[in-house]
Amino acid sequence: MKMKSNFKLWPVGQGLFYSGTIKYENNQNFNFVYDCGSSSMNIDEIVDHYVETSLIDKTLDMLVISHFDEDHISGIPKLLTEVKKIKKIFIPYENGIENYLLFLAFIYGNDGNINEKIDEIILVNSTGPENENNRDFEELNTSIEIEDNFSLPNIKVGVFKGSSIKYRNLWKFKFYNTYLRKTNFSSKIKEEIINLIKDSGCKGLKELLKKLNSPVKNDENCDKEISVKNSLKKIYEKYCSSSYGNSKQNQSSLCLY
């Protein structure tokens, strides 16, 4: 099978935006992005240019997020706006669904929306035992138990235990998790989301994300009300907004080869 590949490191300044296209028979493409962010304000223009020039049908097969510092993910809300579909998003795994919740807090706290845009969010645990029969991109077997109050309609969430996947025997992608240091902050993210759901009078995450502009008390000692959207943004900023080494949750990184 004939194949042609094209890769590009986009000029975003401080941050990272890397894209790739693998072209094969009958003009079919496999498109992927590794990180999409910058400290520069022009990231949205660059994302626009990428979608217009590289995604003919506005479908992205794979988005890989290395970590959650803002200069690596600031362009994702814009990317979600411009594409029709992102089939799979891979994020680093660290002790449960906390990084999944942190990802949602960032997206919805920054005017993003994943409704009907994403098929699957996969947390990658490359330190797990390798399953040789579970490597095909289109048929990955992932599993994780998510409480009903954290699930979202039509979006599958799973954990991939392994270090490599392949796409139609054309290309092999290898993942590697790096851990800077262990923290106990991850469990607090889940706790804060639970409290926000409760304080907003909602029954679960699905309902909460439909009330982004509704007011919620900032805390029990504060009479000032802020919106659900701003509360989610504050949760993200509390745990992972810094790109200078002092973020609390950004102690793991997902490398892609």
Per-region residue spans from a language model:
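Conserved beta-strand hairpin/beta-sheet module of binuclear metal-dependent hydrolase folds
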Residues: K2-T53, K58, L256-Y257
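Generic alpha-helical propensity signal that fires on short helical segments
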Residues: E25, Y50-E52, K78, L102-G109
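Active-site environment of divalent metal-dependent phosphoester hydrolases
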Residues: Q14, S40, F68-I73, N95-E98
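Flexible, acidic/histidine-containing loops and adjacent segments that form or flank the divalent-metal
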Residues: K2-S5, E82-Y257
